[in-house]
Amino acid sequence: MASNDKGLEEIPEGQIESNYDEITDSFDAMDLKPELLRGVYAYGFERPSAIQQRAILPIIKGNDVIAQAQSGTGKTATFSISALQKLDPNVKGCQALILAPTRELAQQIQKVVVAIGDFMNIECHACIGGTNVREDMKALQEGPQVVVGTPGRVQDMIQRRVLRTDNLKMFILDEADEMLSRGFTEQIYDIFQLLPQSTQVVLLSATMPQDVLEVTTKFMRDPVRILVKKQELTLEGIKQFYIAVEKEEWKLDTLSDLYETVTITQAVIFCNTRRKVDWLTDKLTARDFTVSAMHGDMEQAQRDVIMKEFRSGSSRVLIATDLLARGIDVQQVSLVINYDLPANRENYIHRIGRGGRFGRKGVAINFVTADDVRMMREIEQFYSTQIEEMPMNVAGKFNHVDISLD
């Protein structure tokens, strides 16, 4: 961990430049512990994704690493595998600390760490707001080797000296851009001050705004910079359409028409506000569509139940705000509908990346009013992609779009 303020102006905002291009194209060639390798294959990975091929080895070697890659590219497994390789299962106490912007994402990361580390005899605890502080303290006193959490609760636990950092080897910031844009900057800076100087820092971010670059220059030592380019990842395998909707009020009927023509495995519908999520849920329920809804106003326990039902497939359609775009990995999501276009272009990839994770096929449909056209063009330009108009037949009905996952 470094503390210097070298000129930020040298780094163009938005994208880092890679300074590392070595690729390891199989997990076998990474020299992982046998019990970790077994966990990687048991989890269902066959070969490393673009980010895994580039980032796992420099992290294992102990370099500070900045990795810029979008959601759905295998980032979570990248740092989970690296952290598990470096841990000593015989030592109790936090050796890898992972920060995430939302509770859902923290829990998702915990599941991945536990699953990949299944044969290693390690403990991983999720330290998140909205849960009982006493239970958190009790779990941390047992000395789990990996702790993943949201910035507020993690900072609190370190300050109470319940989360000890004496054995800490690695500090990982996932979705750094989102954490900083959610106002966690102060907590993150405080956490850095509380960590041993020797801690290795790994930062992952889809975008590189100025506030993220400041963190990298202040707290990282000669970091290895890895950029998985937008073209390499983004929206391959995801068909993108838009439906021109003349007025906001017509979106609901458009959605009902879609429901009748589209065969869906599972779908997520994104709205920009919590109120809109509740409103749309009520309207669709009144029309006899089965949907569930999720947003940040809900109690944690309620959110957990909804996610569980959605993951198991007992609920097929989930209406959500962007909160969800960062913490959900449901294998079967084949359709994403942007009832509202996202307020910023970075969130577009997080939303529709749900619909084609790890190279699976998916479809994204955007409802676009006259006011949204400019934003849609910006999104197309930013991701070098094309969003085509949804095909209609002569009767003005939507053509059947095949959203199967074969």
From Swiss-Prot:
Family that this chain belongs to: Belongs to the DEAD box helicase family. eIF4A subfamily.
Domain Helicase ATP-binding: 56-226
GO MF terms held by the record: ATP binding; ATP hydrolysis activity; RNA binding; RNA helicase activity; translation initiation factor activity
Name of the featured protein: ATP-dependent RNA helicase eIF4A
Cited Pfam families: DEAD, Helicase_C
EC class of the enzyme, as a word: hydrolase
PANTHER family: ATP-DEPENDENT RNA HELICASE DBP3
Entry-linked CDD domains: DEADc_EIF4AII_EIF4AI_DDX2 (cd18046), SF2_C_DEAD (cd18787)
Sequence motif Q motif, residues: 25-53
Keywords: ATP-binding, Cytoplasm, Helicase, Hydrolase, Initiation factor, Nucleotide-binding, Protein biosynthesis, RNA-binding
Chief localization: cytoplasm
UniProt comment concerning the protein's domains: The Q motif is unique to and characteristic of the DEAD box family of RNA helicases and controls ATP binding and hydrolysis.
EC number(s) stated in the UniProt entry for this protein: 3.6.4.13
Compartments where located: Cytoplasm
Catalytic activity: ATP + H2O = ADP + phosphate + H(+)
Record's function text: ATP-dependent RNA helicase which is a subunit of the eIF4F complex involved in cap recognition and is required for mRNA binding to ribosome. In the current model of translation initiation, eIF4A unwinds RNA secondary structures in the 5'-UTR of mRNAs which is necessary to allow efficient binding of the small ribosomal subunit, and subsequent scanning for the initiator codon.
Residues binding ATP, per UniProt: 69-76
